[in-house]
From Swiss-Prot:
S-S pairs: 5-45, 7-35, 28-46
Entry annotated with the keyword rRNA-binding: no
GO cellular component terms, semicolon-separated: extracellular region; nematocyst
Keywords assigned: Cardiotoxin, Disulfide bond, Ion channel impairing toxin, Nematocyst, Neurotoxin, Secreted, Toxin, Voltage-gated sodium channel impairing toxin
Subcellular location(s) per record: Secreted; Nematocyst
InterPro entries: Anenome_toxin, Myo_ane_neurotoxin_sf
Name of this protein: Delta-actitoxin-Afv1b
One Pfam family of this chain: Toxin_4
Protein purpose: Binds specifically to voltage-gated sodium channels (Nav), thereby delaying their inactivation. This toxin has a great efficacy for Nav1.4/SCN4A (EC(50)=30.62 nM) and Nav1.5/SCN5A (EC(50)=62.5 nM). It is less potent on Nav1.6/SCN8A (EC(50)=about 300 nM), Nav1.1/SCN1A (EC(50)=390.55 nM), Nav1.3/SCN3A (EC(50)=459.36 nM) and Nav1.2/SCN2A (EC(50)=1998.00 nM) (when measured as the increase in the slow component).
GO biological process, one term: regulation of signal transduction
Main location, first listed in the record: secreted
MF term (GO), any: toxin activity
Length: 48
């Protein structure tokens, strides 16, 4: 498992929205894509 994060497609805020991304510290692994244009502060918010 990983730490969930808010993708741009999930909505504007974490409140009441599903967090469909996972934070990866070293960039998105193969087969995943960055799903958040700005942030998170540490790592990348990636989605399969």
């Amino acid at each position: 498992g990983g730490v969930p994060c808010l993708c741009d497609s999930d909505g504007p805020s974490v409140r009441g929205n599903t967090l469909s991304g996972i934070i990866w510290l070293a960039g998105c692994p193969s087969g995943w894509h960055n799903c958040k244009a700005h942030g998170p502060t540490i790592g990348w918010c990636c989605k399969q």
